[in-house]
Amino acid sequence: MSYTMLNNEAIRKYDYATESLEGAALSFIRDLCEGLRFDKNKATSFTENNLDFDGKSLKANQIPYNMEKDIDRLCLENAVNRFLKSGKKEDAFDVYFCYLEMFVGDYQKTRRMIELLSEYEVNGSSLLMKHRDHYSHSVYVFALGLAIYKSNELYQKVYKEYYKISDDKEAAAHYLQYWGLSSLFHDIGYPFELPFEQVCSYFEVEGDKRESRPFVAYHDLDAFISIDDKAKEKLSKIYPGRSFNTTNDVFAYVLNEKMGDVYGFTEDQMRTFLVEKPTQPNKFNHYMDHAYFSATILFRKLFEEMDIEMHSEHLDALTAILMHNSLYKFCIAHYKSEGNKPFKAELHPLAYMLMLCDELQCWDRTAYGRNSKKELHPMGCTFDFSGNNIKAIYLFDEKEMAKVNHFKDEYIEWLQNQNPGKGKAPELKAFSGMYIKENGVSKFQNDIELIVDLSKIHLNVETGFAEHIHSGNRSYLSNSNFINLYKFAIILNGRWGNDGWKRAKLAGQEELYLSDSKVVEEFAEGFKNLSLEYKLSNINQAKAFAKYLNMIGCFYTDKAVDFEQVDRFTDDELISIGKAEHQRWLQEHYDMGWTYGKPEKDKRDFERKHWDMIPDFSGFDVSDEAAEQNYIRLDKAEQDKDTDPMECMLAMLKTYDGLRIYRL
C-alpha cells in the first residue's frame, strides 16, 4: 500500500511509462517514500482499531496524525505531477511550498528568497545579453533527481552506503529531504549575479573581452558571512574540537575533508577561493558565482533566522549547492584540463546528483536575455532511465525547422569548404551542441561526462522535434505576481465567516478593511493552523484568478491602458467564474482522494467525503460539462462559495499589488 493511511482506491493511478521522468519521479514519492514523516508510535494504517486524532486538516484533531502526513505526501506528489504537465512557474510554486512546509517549516519565514528569485528574473533579466529561467528550472532539477534515484540502483547503493542507511524507505525519505534542499534552492543567489551581468551587458561590444569592461564586486561582507553564537554551537556538536567564524570557514573545511586529497587542494586554498569569489570576480574569468551566494544565504536563513536543528547532511546540501556552478569546474577539477577527474558520486552523492541534473536540465527554460531569445533551445525532453542508464531525447519545436535546416546547410557548406583548423564552425545554440557529434558523442554530452563520472551509468543524448509541449500554458494576459500570492491565500481563507469582512463588503469598503494590518495578522495566524492541503487549496484558488479573467475577456495590469476598468463583475461573468471555480475545486478534491458522500460535518475530513462532490462519479478527471451539471444542482449558498472569493480578489489586487482590472 503506497498511502497506508488513505483509501488507495480513491487515488489516481498514473499511466506514465515506469522509466520515464514523470513515471519514475512520481513513483519515488508514492512507492519509495511510504510512511514519510510518520510517527511510528501512532497508527500507521487507517484500518487499525485504535486510531489517534492528533492530526490537523481544516482544524486541529480532525484526523489521525499519520493520515495528515500521508495527505502531505500526496500534496507533494500532485504538485510535482502538475508541474511536469504544465512547466508553468505557477505550478513550480506549489512544489517549493510543499517542500518548505514539510521539511523546513513556516513558509512565511522563507518566502522572500523564493519569490524574489522569480521577480528578479522576470523584471531584471531582459537587460542581459544571456539569461534563462532558474525558478522553474530548479523544480525540474528536483524532479529529475527523484527519477534518477528511483530508477538507478547503482546510485541508490552509493547513497545508502555513504549515509550508512540500510532500509530502502528510510534512505528514500532521507534523500527526499536533503536532495530537495540541494536542488530547489541551488539558484536562490541569482539576484547577486544579475547586477554583475547587467553591468557587463551594458558595456558589451561585439568582439571585446570582459577584462576590458567595468565590473561589479561585493565588499564589506563580514556581517553576511559571519556565524552567530547559536550556529557556532550547532557546528561544535557536529565537528567537536573545530571552531568556525564564517561560512567560508565551514564550507572550506567540509569540502577539504570530502575531496581535498583527491583534487589536491588544502582547506586554506579553498577558503581563499571562497573569500575572493564575491570580492574579486576578475580572478575568475570575470564571472560572478551565484552558487556562492545561494549556499551562504541558505546557511543564514536556516540556522540563524529560523534557528532549525543542524545536521551534517544540511552542510552536505549547502556544499553541493556551493560546488554546482563554477567552483568545481574551474577551482577544484579544472574540468577541461588534461588532468581532469570526473566527479564520483562516492565523494559527495548530493553534489554529484546536483551537477548531473543541473547540466541535463536545459529544456523548457524561459529565455529572458536578448541573445538567449534568439537561440534555439529544447522545449521538452523525454527520458528513458532503464538499465541504470540515462537516455535523453531533447525535443525542439517543429515550427523552428526552417531555422534548423538553414543551420544544417551552413554547417555542411563549412565542412566542405573549410581548411583544417581554420574558420569557426556555424552554431545554433543549443541545438548545434546536441546535434553535431564527434565519435558518436555531442559536445553537450561530452561536457557532462567531463564534469561527472558516467563510467558506470551510460548517458545517451539525442535530438528530436515535436509540437510545442506546453503550447497555450502561458497565454494569459495577466501574470501571477508571487510577491503577494501567499497573502492572497491568507485573505481568501480568513474572510470565511468573518463578520468584519461581510460588513466591509456591504459598505463597499473592502480595500480599507484589507489595509488594516491587524486584520491581516489575525488572518495569517489562522492560515498557519491549516493543514498543507487546505493551504494549497487557497493558494491555487488565488492562482486561478488570472485564468478566470482571461476566460471572461478581462485582464489586470499596473500600467495605464485605454480599456474599460472593472470594479464589479456582471452577473453573467460571475456565473461563468463560479462554474470554472467549481470545476477547479472538484478536480482538486478528486486528485486528493475525496469522493461524494454525506458524512457528519466533523467527520468529513477523516472520511474524505463531501456532499458537493459529484454523485455516482467514478472517474478522476472532471470535465467542464460534469462540473457545470453538478454546479447547477447546488443551492445558492453553495454556489456563492465559488464566486465570493473572486470578488475578494478584485479588492486584494488593488490593495496589495496596485493593479487594476480591465475588460477587453
Predicted regions and their residues:
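Acidic/His-rich, divalent-metal-binding segments that scaffold phosphate/diphosphate chemistry
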Residues: R12-A223, D261-D268
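Active-site-adjacent bridging/hinge elements
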Residues: D106-N123, D261-L274, L506-A524, S618-A626
